[in-house]
């Protein structure tokens, strides 16, 4: 398609795009909830909360856990719990616990999606500049990329603490494009969620939406990315590079 003709660089989201981080995130969320004597959520539910950074993840987890506890107590005929700690303070405590537990389980609970490593290698070898934009707290990003052996492919990495405004705000994408030395329209952004596509549109970047990510249980097509792919390595032929499998473009 025309928007991919003059691409000089590619930037990627992390969670749900390059890596399946749900097992580690869910484990850390549940350990934090358990430490506060709140119901645990489980991976299937936590997946629907991923995408807006750790603070929002904690807010969603706490809101659900308090409602779930109230429902369970009502079912058992028990009186509601008198919340002596304000929700804002509980979120702060939960975030502190989450950070500690996630630091322990992040690497063992995160896995590359199929074709990610070889596709990043091919893109890098072609001369394209690569960047990473994630809402994940910055201290977790570099160690995770190193443990997965993909840090070497990225010239610029922007974590959630590196900007004032996280995705879907365009700020992190504009920052990456600037540091890569190109205009936003020359940088393709690849993600799995509506936050990614909204950020790309606001920044003026062409976008690819991947169908296998998290995206709050919604189809990525609803966000209207420029192109939709089922497999990560479908990026290669779209950018004029060899690809042994048949790519399937869902829309133009």
UniProtKB/Swiss-Prot annotation:
It comes from the Bacteria. It is an enzyme of class 3 (hydrolase). GO terms for biological process: carbohydrate metabolic process; DNA repair; glycolate biosynthetic process. It catalyses: 2-phosphoglycolate + H2O = glycolate + phosphate. The active site is at residue 13. Pathway: Organic acid metabolism; glycolate biosynthesis; glycolate from 2-phosphoglycolate: step 1/1. The keyword Glycoprotein does not apply. Its EC number is 3.1.3.18. The keyword Metal-binding applies. Keywords: Carbohydrate metabolism, Chloride, Hydrolase, Magnesium, Metal-binding. GO terms for molecular function: metal ion binding; phosphoglycolate phosphatase activity. It holds the Pfam family HAD_2. Specifically catalyzes the dephosphorylation of 2-phosphoglycolate. Is involved in the dissimilation of the intracellular 2-phosphoglycolate formed during the DNA repair of 3'-phosphoglycolate ends, a major class of DNA lesions induced by oxidative stress. Belongs to the HAD-like hydrolase superfamily. CbbY/CbbZ/Gph/YieH family. This is Phosphoglycolate phosphatase.
